[in-house]
Amino acid sequence: MRRAVGPLLAVTVALVLADSAVVTLALPDILRHLDTSVGQVAWVLISFNLVLGLVAVPIAVVFGRAQPRFFSAVGIAVFAGSSAWCALAQSIEVLIAARCVQALGGALALVGCLELLVAKYGARRGVAAWVTAGVVGTATGPFAGGLLTQAFSWQAIFVVQVPFAVLAVPAALAVRAAPELSPDRHRPAVRPNLTLALLSAALTAALFLLVLLLVEGWHHSPGLAALTVSVVPVAALGARPLARLLQPPAQVEVAVGCFLIAGGLVGLALLPSADLVWTIAPQALVGLGLGLTVDRLTSQAMEMRLPRVRHAGWTISARHIGVVVGLAILTPVFTADLQDAEVPAQEAIASLVLDAPLKPDDKIAIAQSLGRELTQQQGQVPDLHRAFETADLAPEERPAAAQLERDLDEQLERAATRAFRDSFLIGAGLALLALLTVVAPHRKTTS
C-alpha cells in the first residue's frame, strides 16, 4: 500500500482535472437520455468548471491552517460519493447539482493532494508530480470520456472514478503531513495565471468544440471521435521530452506553445473537408502547445511563492474560470453560426432532391420526410438517415436514393465545418492574446 500512495494521489489529481472536459463527448447521449435541452445540458460541463474555479482559492486559504491528510481524505470521499451520484442521476437538475458537489470535493482533493505529494516526495518532486498529473488529466479527459460512452454509457464515465477515489482515501490518510504555516509573503503571480486563463479559454475550442464538430457535425460515434482527439494528449505527452532535449528558456517555451495552439486552431478553422485525417496535424500542434505551456505556467505561478497551497489554488481558479469564459464566448458564436447555416443548407438540400434521378412521387415523399427531420432537429446539424430509412422506394430506386443521401450528408458536413470556423478563429485569437501576455515587457520594480 505504501508504494501505491503517491500514484493514487496523482491519479486523483488527474481524475479531478479530467472532469473539466470528460463529459464533452457524452453530452449528446445525456441530452437524449435525460430528455433535456442543449442549453441545460451545457451546464453539466459549465457547472463543474465554474464551481471549481470559484472555490479553489477560498479552500486553499482555509487549507493552509488545516490538517492536510484529514481534509484531503474528506475531499476525495466527497468526490467519490458525488461521482456515484452523477451516475445515478435521472434528471438534468440532479446531474448538475451532483456535478457542483463533485467540483467542491474535487477542489479539496486537488489542494490536499499537492501538500500530500510534497510531504511524500519533497517540494520539487511533489509539485512536479502534481502539475504533470493535472496536464495528463486535462489532455486525456475527452478521449477517456468518449471511449467509455461508446463502450458502455455516459454513466460509466462517473462509475469508473469511484473505485480509484475510494482507494485514494486511505492513501491520503497514510501520509503524515503538517499544515503549511508559511506566512502570506507573496502576491499571486498575475502574468502566468492570466496566461493560463487565456490558454484555457482557447483550449476550450480544441477540447470542446472539436469533439462537438466530430460527433454532432460529422455524425461520428463517440468512440471514433475519442480515438481521433487522442492526438492531443499523445502530442502533449511528447512535448515534455522535446522541451528537455532542446532546453529553451522558459519564456520562449511558453511563447512557442501559445503560438502552436493558435496555429492548430487556425488549422481546424480552415479544414478543407470533413475528413478526420485533416484534423490530425492541427490537433498535434494544439497538443504540443498544451504540453509546452500548462505545466510550465503552473510551475511559474507557484515557484518560490508562499504559502504554496494558496498559489496552487490561484492556478486552479485561473484554469477553470478560463474554461467557463471560453465556453461563454464560443458557445453563442457557433450556435448563431449553426442557425445562420440552416437556410442555405435547406436550399442546397432542396436543389439536390430536385436534381436527383428519382421518380417525382419518390422525390415528394423523400422531401416530406426530410422536412420533418429538419423541423424535429432544428438548432443542430440534422441526421437525415431516418428519412431515407423510412422511405417506401422501389428496389431500382434505392441506388439513386443512397447516392442522394451521401450527397446530402456531404452538404451538411460542409455546412457544419463552416459553422464552426469563426469559433476556432476566436479560440486562436485567445491563444494569441495569451502569447502577448508572455512577450509583453515586464514592468521593472525597485525594492
What are these regions (language model features)?
Residues 162-183, 434-443:
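C-terminal membrane-cytosol helix-exit motif in multi-pass small-molecule transporters
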Residues 5, 365-447:
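Transmembrane-helix exit segments and adjacent C-terminal regions of multi-pass membrane proteins
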Residues 125-143, 318-327:
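Glycine-rich segments within core transmembrane alpha-helices of 12-TM secondary carriers
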